[in-house]
Amino acid sequence: MIFWFCNQPPRMELFQCSWVPYSYSIVSTTSYWPSPDFSQAAFIAANAVVMGSVKIAAGASIWYGAVVRADVESIEIGECTNIQDGAILHGDPGLPTVLEDHVTVGHRAVIHSAHIERGSLIGIGAVILDGVRVGAGSIIGAGSIVTKNIPPLSLVVGVPGKVLRPITPEEAADLIQHAERYKKLALVHAGKGSDIGFYPQE
């Protein structure tokens, strides 16, 4: 087992500053919720928390430390969509969380009772709040907080998030390709492939 420790005051508890590779999947905290069907996913990290009414489409991936908690409302993860490390998906009753195909959810992003349309990218640490719909092919910049609907093909930045400019067709196409590359990388992490997707194959 590998441990990594930060330089912290000596009274800091050990587990607050360590990395531990888990050897099991956390899929439910109680038998009240059935375990989701992982059979179509490209990769589910061993220490991801995925529980409740979660629908996972073919080629989707849920990465290390992510939380997909569908205990009070459903969550749908589309084909080739990736939920990166530390991201959180949750929702309130009556407001399901939906991620369509080829969506990228960056590290530590939070999506709560929102609908993310096809080919969008949610940047690192961004927050998408209840009832928001992000239009297809959009980019939500890192750290943005989105409280209102976003038109398709929009670059959004800031707190609260505002449209900075349109996304070009070339940029939108690259967002789809980025999700495809993440699918290849996910298959390598799952032990099902050798092409990590981000470099040319020799």
Residue spans for each PLM region:
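Short beta->alpha connector loops at strand-helix junctions that form conserved
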Residues: 72, 91-93, 167
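C-terminal segments of enzyme domains that contribute to small-molecule binding surfaces
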Residues: 14, 19-21, 27-33, 37, ...
